């Protein structure tokens, strides 16, 4: 939206102009490029998605984070479960595979929000390996939860930072309702 939706259109047009869109050859091989990207659930239109597919886009990673209304409201994503679901189906309809990034362990995560996520995954027919909410240095969460992080790491912030390489592993827990075991 910041580019008034012109950049992606221009990129797709250039891929066609330079003859880089995927085409199957007679021998069964392909020429051109398949590509992917990331997007926000609110920043697409069905028209631009179809244009992207026609230019070779095979999948889009969406930072949906959660399908829980109360979690989405508190993390300030600017999206809702409804916009997440709408973008999921619009992307599928355009012939692009939507890949949802999901996060568990938000500060206000609870059993209700976890159940809402599981229900959405089942309803949408998607398999998800969620990431854990992580207070990266420089983020608001790091500032807010620094004392808690230091306690969890026995005062050794360097060990916490070294643990940050894999977002599918639990580092410092920032959930108000669950501990690392739960």
Residue ranges and their predicted role:
Residues 6, 111-112:
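Short N-terminal helix/helix-N-cap motif within the alpha/beta-hydrolase-1
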């Amino acid at each position: 939206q910041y580019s008034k939706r012109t950049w992606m259109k221009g990129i797709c047009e250039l891929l066609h102009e330079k003859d880089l869109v995927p085409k199957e050859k007679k021998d069964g091989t392909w020429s051109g490029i398949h590509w992917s990207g990331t997007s926000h659930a609110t920043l697409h239109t069905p028209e631009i998605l179809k244009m992207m597919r026609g230019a070779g886009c095979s999948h889009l990673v969406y930072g949906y984070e959660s399908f829980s209304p109360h979690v989405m409201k508190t993390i300030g994503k600017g999206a809702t479960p409804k916009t997440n679901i709408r973008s999921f189906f619009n992307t599928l309809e355009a012939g692009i595979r939507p890949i949802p990034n999901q996060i568990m362990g938000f500060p206000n995560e609870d059993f209700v929000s976890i159940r809402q996520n599981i229900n959405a995954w089942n309803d949408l027919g998607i398999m998800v390996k969620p990431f854990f909410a992580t207070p990266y240095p420089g983020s608001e969460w790091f500032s807010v939860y620094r004392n808690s992080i230091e306690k969890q790491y026995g005062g050794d912030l360097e060990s916490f930072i070294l643990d940050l390489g894999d977002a599918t592993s639990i580092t410092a827990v920032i959930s108000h309702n669950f501990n690392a075991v739960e």
